Amino acid sequence: MPTSHLPTSMSCIAIREPGGPEVLVPQQQPMPSPAEGEILVKVMAAGVNRPDVLQRKGLYPPPKGTSEIPGLEIAGEVVAIGRNVTRWKQGEKVMALVGGGGYAEYCLAFEGHALPLPATLSMIEAAAIPETFFTVWYNVFERGKLAKGETFLVHGGSSGIGTTAIQLAKALSARVFTTAGTPEKCAACRKLGADLAINYRTEDFVALTKEATEGRGVDVILDMVGGDYIGRNYEAAAVEGRIVQIAFQAASRANVDMMRLMLKRLTHTGSTLRARSVADKSAIARAVETHALPLIAAGKVRPVIDSTFPLHQASAAHARMEDGDHIGKIVLTL
């Protein structure tokens, strides 16, 4: 579909140089055009995620061939389609996982990485779904194989990932434990359905999860911390437990007792999302559409929105994320 009906340039947020939030600056760039299998979305809201912060600092460069504009999830309206796109039409509302480019007025997405906008959600809520729901579904339920009746521990329960993981695991009948850094954050996690919320600053999550499981330990652990949490996760895990690593905010290296892993027959795996193939991410999208979107439609799961900022205040949104006080997702609006 031609894009002659659209502007030739767009507003976006560029990273002037690696650094703090202040390096995020408004800029004009040429309008992208959808290639085969792609859709062009007029962005109405874009989620802010921890990888965006790492990219801004120069620690997480975009994969080859993707936009250098930050932003990994969007919601908006399809305004143009590339060749061989069959699912989406101009004017339809979608939310989409993108490899980059979300902090902009217009953004390209692969056809298979877009999902229909649930009627129960606003654009702001929809923009908070793709990165977190794709990450949680794939890592907790596909890699971690969390099953009904099992126990689940997610660190950082008040984050976008954490608030999503608590709700999805609870909706699918797991017993949910989480860690958070303040009494207020722990209370928010309990309100979302966590059976046990542990203040990691004042309490020992290993001891408390052992007590809650009568010494058995936790079946599945989703960890974004790394560092010394790795060894402590091995202590907290049940025999045949599964630990899934999706980040390492403390450290990527750890000195751990491998004998504990062997004796408990633990599985410690991990993954990233951004660099996965188009086909892989399309498969995850279909799984989210099949299993998670009905839970949203039924009101059992809902994105938690901490705050919103207009696009030109992306630097303030990043400062909010880095101050550590947020509960749920931070979203940019256009």
Which residues are covered by each model-predicted region?
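Short glycine-centered segments of the SAM/dcSAM-binding site in methyltransferase folds
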Residues: 93, 151, 175, 242, ...
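C-terminal capping/lid region of NAD(P)-dependent oxidoreductase domains
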Residues: 2-10, 293, 298-307, 315-334
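N-terminal Rossmann-fold NAD(P) dinucleotide-binding loop
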Residues: 162-163
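Phosphate-coordination loops involved in phosphoryl transfer and adenosine-cofactor binding
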Residues: 9, 148-150, 218, 240
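Glycine-rich phosphate-binding loop and adjacent beta-alpha segment
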Residues: 180-183, 225-301, 326, 334
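NAD(P)H dinucleotide-binding glycine-rich loop of Rossmann-like/cofactor-binding domains
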Residues: 54, 69, 87, 93-158, ...
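Glycine-rich beta-strand-centered segment in the early N-terminal region that forms part
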Residues: 30-48, 59-101
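Adenosine-nucleotide cofactor-binding segment
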Residues: 154, 170-232, 284
